[in-house]
Amino acid sequence: MNIAALISGGVDSAVVVHLLCEQGYKPDLFYIKIGMDGDEDLTCTAEEDIELCTATARKYGLSLNIIDLHRQYWDNVVAYAIDKVKRGLTPNPDVMCNKLIKFGCFEQEAGHLYDKTATGHYASILEKDGKIWLGTAQDPVKDQTDFLAQIDYLQISKLMFPLGGLMKNEVRDIARIAKLPSAQRKDSQGICFLGKINYNEFLRRFLGEKEGDIIEMETGKRIGTHKGYWFHTIGQRKGLGLGGGPWFVIRKDIDENIIYVSHGYDTDKQYGTDFALHDFHFITEDLWKGAPSADVSFKIRHTDTFMKGILTREDNLFRIHSHVPLQGIAPGQFGVLYDKNAEICVGSGEITLS
């Protein structure tokens, strides 16, 4: 079996290479470059990444190929993120990167030449009723199925997740014992293309600043100013620059550039327990066979907690009623649905409050 292994320079993908080689495979290694050339601030740690990837390839006598997809990434993933922010929504570029770049453009460029593509994602492949499903990882803290919830059946059919049955500490132990070049490297945080700058600085470069009012939700009183609604997301409590906190962002008026905040943030009163998903995407198929309601697990952000609730259908919307109050439901983010035992990731849709 011919295997392409996506390698990033991190410990997870290096352990994937080690495990594949231990099983007798000789995968071809691929590093996907997505950082923007010509701007030292807006680049990933590509040079260091490639050095570690090269060392890993050399250790196992494998070939390393560098695939430059930075233009496709910026034209699709970054453009998507900026568009969502302009519309007052909260984007998830990691989800779109997996769908469009890692398992989209890469498949067109090189992946189609291989039987399987292996990655360091914490997820698993399950077979049920003769079909392939995206399964959750053994390690709930590291589970990344929510980042994979927009891929399609053809993509999931080609993927291998060798780390799916391992805990993170076990992965670290394997890397240490095998003396992998990246064994001591820290896990990456945040969005890769941001490089050396933070998210707000990235938004400032592309969207600028525009002063607007901060209004207390309960009283309608103006209590401060902000530099643009695009710097703030629903549920946010840091970075508002207000005294007497904590303050939470409750709502955004993008037409008037107003941020509404609340001092107490009572989730029952501010949001309740219900939200909707539109344009729902099934990875394999409808696990619930079109049933009008079903018990489900779900996530509304990247977290180690699978929430419990009830799914109902209304026209083109999936409505979710959570068993417990939710904080910071952010329109634009992906709501990810699982079976009630949180073993199968069924798919995802974009969160809306309508």
UniProtKB/Swiss-Prot annotation:
> Could you say which residues are annotated as the site Interaction with tRNA?
121, 333
Localization of this protein: Cytoplasm
Recorded GO molecular functions are: ATP binding; tRNA binding; tRNA-uridine 2-sulfurtransferase activity
Keywords in alphabetical order: ATP-binding, Cytoplasm, Disulfide bond, Nucleotide-binding, RNA-binding, Transferase, tRNA processing, tRNA-binding
Pfam families per the UniProt record, alphabetical:
tRNA_Me_trans, tRNA_Me_trans_C, tRNA_Me_trans_M
Top-level taxon in the UniProt lineage: Bacteria
Q: Name one GO cellular component term.
A: cytoplasm
Does DNA-binding appear among the keywords?
no
What does the sequence similarity comment in the record state about its family? Belongs to the MnmA/TRMU family.
Record-given protein name? tRNA-specific 2-thiouridylase MnmA 1
Q: Which organism is it from?
A: Phocaeicola vulgatus (strain ATCC 8482 / DSM 1447 / JCM 5826 / CCUG 4940 / NBRC 14291 / NCTC 11154) (Bacteroides vulgatus)
Q: Which gene encodes it?
A: mnmA1
